[in-house]
Structure formats: structure tokens, C-alpha cells
Amino acid sequence: MNNVFVYCEIEGTIVAEVSQELLTKGRKLANELGVELEAVVAGSGIKGNVEQQILPYGVDKLHVFDAEGLFPYTSAPHTSILVNLFKEEKPQICLMGATVIGRDLGPRVSSSLTSGLTADCTQLEIGNYDDVKTRKHYEKLLYQIRPAFGGNIVATIVNPDHRPQMATVRSGVMQKAIYEGEAKGEVVYPDVAKYVPETDYVVKVIDRHIEAAKHNLKGASIVVAGGYGVGSKEGFDQLFQLAKELHGEVGASRAAVDAGWVDHDRQVGQTGVTVHPKVYIACGISGQIQHIAGMQDAGIIISINSDPEAPINKIADYIITGTVEEVVPKLIKYYKQNSK
């Protein structure tokens, strides 16, 4: 009762990294609230295969739903599992990944339970709230923080009266870490038939095709990212060359992606990928809130910008004032000279 729950996604018997990141965050939230962390995982043939991918992150109780028809994911069975389980357990918080599955499952569950859901959160915190209209004071609510209105503001959203408080978070936003404290580590295997009616299995997945990743932007130790200031698709060729020399990957701002200069899968930010490289080189990027949300935890941030007052310069460790056209070729030249 009143615990923090994390829905864990799987591919076969492999737990998604975003779920492990959320377990880490969920453990911190549970500690702050003085409650337990519980996890839910559903699939086929997963008993004995997923427990040790979940429990080390500080889970007090793990609910493993194992039955034919639960993998590959389809909407109805997984929705029934969470809705019926939550009616029994009455969690105060539920977290899930802002993935294809999470974006389908989260709204279904929140709608069924008439609770709120905040998508694509960049921060999750615990805090108090005073409602100026009702003059009610609420203790220890979940602050669901995310950029809003096109990234022009950072909104803090609360759900005072309805439970669970639900939020989705993109992969890479939270850091995952094995929990060093004590947790119960209890595992239960509920009877799936008590939670999922046979009619939920009406949809069958006949075949699946998973496209191989074109790059490793999320895991790159060096990211060279370009914004609208790069000027053209040809300008990005210079960034690809620099990234190749540095053994890094190329990222982009939303403005550059919208201009058609680079593919969407390279977009860094609130509506793209969240990265944690050792070095992030921002080329011609102004630094809108939604972009900064996806790269602010980089080890070293280098800004190349013709505008010395660009917002991104406020978080940059090093600033090179100049155009991308004049600075990047020099970086390539001098790196080649000094790396021989």
C-alpha cells in the first residue's frame, strides 16, 4: 500500500535499460517517502531469467507475471495486469519508460484509474504543494518536471488528489546504479488468469522486424552536435568529419533536424535522445531548454558559437566564439597534427 512502483519492460528475457534507470530513481524516491519500492514485469518464459536484472536495484517486492501471450507486448493484457494490480496494491507513484510501449501503456492505465500522467519528465522530485484555490496543503507529492510550451519554460506538475501519480521518462535521463543499501528482494508469481481475461488476448503478433541501430549516440563518450547555426546539410559534413577524427558520434538540435539537415534519430533533447558523454561539443546551438535537458549532464561541454550571449554558454565549460565554418575545420586540422 502506498508504495512506489516501476513497470519494467523486457525484450525476450532482457530487462530494458530505461527500466533499470527508473528502478534506481524509484529507490531514491521510496527512501525519501519512507515506503517500499516494487517492480512489475510481464512476459513469456521469464521466470528465473529476469529477477537478477531487477532486484539488485533495491527492489523490495517484484511481481513477475509469466504466461503465454504476454510477449511480444500487446496493449490489453499488460493494461489489465497493471490496472488490476494497482487496484489491489494502491501505489502512490508509478514510473515507466517513455518508450513506444510506455507511451501506449501509461495513458491506458492512468485513464482506467482516473489518475494523472506526465510524459517525458526530465526530473522527478518529492516536495510539498499549497493549492491557492482550495487552501489545501499537500505533503510529499511527486514533482513531475519537464519542459513545456516548446521548451520555453520548465513546468513542475503535481497530481494532488488522484493515485497513482504517474510519469514516463526517456531512456538516459536518469542514471542507473546498483543499490548498496538493504532491500527485501521478495519475488511473487501471481496467477495471470486472475488479472487478465481471455478476451484480452484477441490480438496476436504474427511477426516482428527490429531495425538495427544506425549509430551509438546514446552511449558515445564524445558527441559533436550541430544546431541551426551550422547553416546547411553540407555544414554537417564537417561535424561528421570531426566526430570521425575524435571517434565520437554526431548529434543535433531540434532546429537542425526540422531543417532537414540531419536525421531525427540524432536529435538530442527533450524530444530526442538524452546523452551523457565525457565531452559534448555544441556547434552553432543556441541552447533552448528542451535541448539542454538532453545533454546537461555531459562531463565537459564545449560551445562553438558566434553569439557570445548564447544561452548554452551559461552551462559550457569552454567557449569558442566564432562561426562553425571557421572553427571546426581548424579543430580537425590541429587534432590531426597533434594525434600522429
Residue ranges and their predicted role:
Residues 1-340:
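N-terminal glycine-rich FAD/FM-binding segment characteristic of electron-transfer flavoproteins
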